[in-house]
């Protein structure tokens, strides 16, 4: 018997076998039900980290389990390969981004194969391959033709370090999410996707996703930010123009004492009077250079400047001063905000700073507020005051009443507004999919025809960030002919945001080599939606929102039949060490390659699955890894020690088993039930593994403490086989090797999942407690189906009980079936 599991040679042998036999190749069509299991594909940074290992191990358990349950499982892998790190590596090391990326892909593919993940590698894709980004460009054109892609001048987030623009979602705490540099605001011509056209559907359809974590849905709901209110016009005094504001609180309209407009608003230059112009221009220039977070953060000082203009409150007829304010953003609402200092804290602070009136228009029940003495704004409910025609009305009733009143006079309209902004997709960098647009002096903006795709990235470029796209440095790329008139034209030199590529890759996996379209319609109909999607919660807003948007547009185009891409979503926790996320700067990184070399793939997988539930953060523990390694060695020794004994043992009906043999079989079937439910209904892989460990303990007890003459080899054979089948998704190498060593020629990964016998789950005997006057005095085993009267008699016949009640009067005996018998004496 081999005492030790030598994983290195066994893993290498089995990897070759699995690849040769195509164990993980899944057909596109069959009579079996489908299941699409997908982990978010990685950026090819060069090496797997432990977060990757956990993500892919979780997905692999699900994929293997569903395969064993009779499904055709689509479980692919690819590479989110465009992006700034490759370009920065080119700048730093003088290596072309393409070569850096493909070298990294080769390294990470090898590491994933070492991990033993059940990917169908025939479906591998990389978003930087022309065969992929050709269809990214094709999809851009479809959006363009539907009016969903447009170019506009707009204030954008600019990262001076990366020398490119960032989407709102890519700005975190006022800095670039990638390099943390403080973000600036600039006004540039950029390409956008009109995601706001789908805001309502994106919001409402969250209700169709019961398989998503509630926190992710709440994050998306808040980002979309639906508000119901009114757009109200404040005429500008002495002009034919009006300032329009959106508000959810028309009930506070009588309390407006000033108006604020964004520094970027075109009205600023038109309404500012000559004597205020120089100061206002200096103020707006200063405010526009700040990031959005700097301008809106609670701790940042709110500043404003009087423009010299006044507007008229349409409800009261009162003129109020117009300020330009740094906290008002052009891209939110109308770019104008009415100031109601008595009932909004930010407005209150602004009014106190600039000596503006504070007028109370909502009085709470049982209190009397005075604007001159208030220390903070009142934002609660109450009744209106100082609002002619609406005084004494409850403020909740006044909201629609005032809106209707103004609407009848042409001064307001009911409106729904969203916090969500259109998706900025253009980037001034090289390593991305070129935007398939050309500019012709005669024809204007011209989309590249489909037969002209892909628009290939040139190689004769310099990568140093200058604020202009590196593609501008390639004359052969820039200079082209107009597809419409044949005259000279210039190509668009911005590239697409990498989220463009990752917003549709799950469709491409269904037919990754399709050349007549982005996917085959029959195949995408067969596999979509993704049944289980797995990835980090950090993608809740960007990738997941964009993917949902893409899917809805593609549904409207008739290219797919689903409106939501991911039925179920699991957001796994982080891998921590010493209580912190692993990072080089903290010096707490654990290399997966080191762990794989030292302990093997099965131990590595088992630990990240056993150490914590998947949605919780996992604390790295060297002792925990050692424990998983020892467990697998125990399984190895146990199975090898009984292999000869159980080989050829004929099955025995459960009805013929008694005593220890029946108990061993019962434990086996109880474990099957536990592991099945933990994987299928809860993804509690840690408790599933724990149940397998308990089964191994029981098997050792059965082997070592039951005399061979009393031990039925068929019972041990069943326990061994079921144990290996249960371990196959978690420890695929060990399970497959031991399966072969116990006489099975086929791979265990072609075997069905074991079923349990419900009748065997019921215990023959149960332990009951004997209480005398409420105190536990004895315990004994009785038949599980014993009648209450028989329980009573059995307990009273016990010598220990008889001794304890001797000389006392038994007042009553209360049997509780399956639990206890309580005897009351005096």
UniProtKB/Swiss-Prot annotation:
Record-annotated disulphide pairs: none
InterPro entries per the UniProt record, alphabetical: aa-tRNA-synth_I_CS, aa-tRNA-synth_Ia, Leu-tRNA-ligase, Leu_tRNA-synth_edit, M/V/L/I-tRNA-synth_anticd-bd, Methionyl/Leucyl_tRNA_Synth, Rossmann-like_a/b/a_fold, tRNAsynth_Ia_anticodon-bd
Reaction equations catalysed: tRNA(Leu) + L-leucine + ATP = L-leucyl-tRNA(Leu) + AMP + diphosphate
Record's subcellular location: Cytoplasm
Gene Ontology CC terms, in alphabetical order: cytosol
Annotated GO biological process: leucyl-tRNA aminoacylation
Primary subcellular site in the record, as a coarse category: cytoplasm
Keyword Nucleotide-binding: yes
A molecular function (GO) term: leucine-tRNA ligase activity
NCBIfam families: leuS_bact
Family to which the UniProt record says this protein belongs: Belongs to the class-I aminoacyl-tRNA synthetase family.
Protein name in UniProt: Leucine--tRNA ligase
Lineage, highest ranks first: Bacteria, Bacillati, Bacillota, Clostridia, Thermoanaerobacterales
Encoding gene, per UniProt annotation: leuS
